[in-house]
Design a protein with these regions (language model features):
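Short Pro-Gly-centered flexible turn/kink motifs
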Residues: 131-140
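Sec-dependent N-terminal signal peptides
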Residues: 3-13
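Positively charged n-region of N-terminal signal peptides that target proteins for export
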Residues: 1-4, 94-96, 105
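Extended, low-hydrophobicity, Ser/Thr/Pro/Gly-biased non-transmembrane segments
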Residues: 83-97, 101, 113-115, 141-232
Length: 232
């Protein structure tokens, strides 16, 4: 009995002794909307710094647009559990996905594989182990077919709601990796990061988003004109 108690106390003390850390993730994304085909074509660069005390041999990544791909996704199954059939009866042409992924790490091609349960989570095998305090540059093209709005990503005609649309690393923290599928109910546990995003749209569109506009004097003037119309 004493051995069990001592072991339990040791585990608690050991857990409190570990230091908190966050991985450092910086995104650079260039993406273009095709409003005829309802698609996104993009290229992504991610600078990833390993602030943990562990050496990483692989990274878990979320490719959440695949949640809209088939009836076997965690999203589809959640809808069914909740008695919602709108995903089940969505036509194939109105569903979504992400493909054209071709990952490289510091210029070296990296292999990857799907999670055993979820089609919207993948594991990227690193060409070289990522040691503590080291950084890598992750690059990949990507192509997203936007679904008709079923959940938070999609379109209704030429109105677009774009969220969780790019490949992103899962959180790695003091408790290890946190790969998770996209779900309609619940929120997302993601690494804090910085974003530099270039978005190309047909001229008739306007973006409503957070962030700091770079070189957007004409956009600010347009918004000011709308404000004046509203005050009139």
């Amino acid at each position: 009995m004493k051995k069990i108690i001592l072991s339990f106390i040791f585990l608690i003390v050991g857990g409190y002794g570990q230091k908190y850390f966050q991985q450092d993730v910086a995104y650079n994304i260039d993406v273009k909307l095709n409003d005829s085909l309802h698609t996104l074509s993009g290229y992504e660069k991610i600078t990833y710094i390993n602030n943990s005390n562990e050496t990483l041999d692989y990274l878990w990544f979320h490719i959440w647009p695949n949640a809209y791909k088939s009836d076997s996704s965690a999203l589809a199954k959640q809808f069914i559990r909740l008695g919602n059939t709108k995903f089940k009866y969505t036509k194939e042409k109105n569903r979504g996905f992400i493909d054209s992924l071709d990952f490289s790490i510091d210029g070296i091609k990296a292999g990857w594989e799907y999670h055993s349960q979820w089609n919207d989570v993948i594991k990227i095998n690193l060409p070289e182990p990522l040691k503590p305090k080291e950084k890598i540059l992750i690059e990949t093209p990507f192509f997203v077919k936007l679904p008709k709005i079923i959940s938070r990503l999609g379109h209704n005609g030429q109105h677009y709601e774009i969220t969780q649309w790019y490949p992103k690393p899962a959180v790695y923290d003091i408790n290890g990796w946190h790969p998770m599928p996209y779900l309609n109910m619940g929120e997302f546990y993601s690494e804090f990061g910085t974003f530099d995003v270039k978005i190309t749209l047909p001229k008739k569109y306007r973006i409503m988003a957070t962030g700091d506009l770079v070189g957007g004097a004409s956009e600010i003037a347009w918004l000011d004109s709308l404000a004046k119309e509203g005050d009139a």
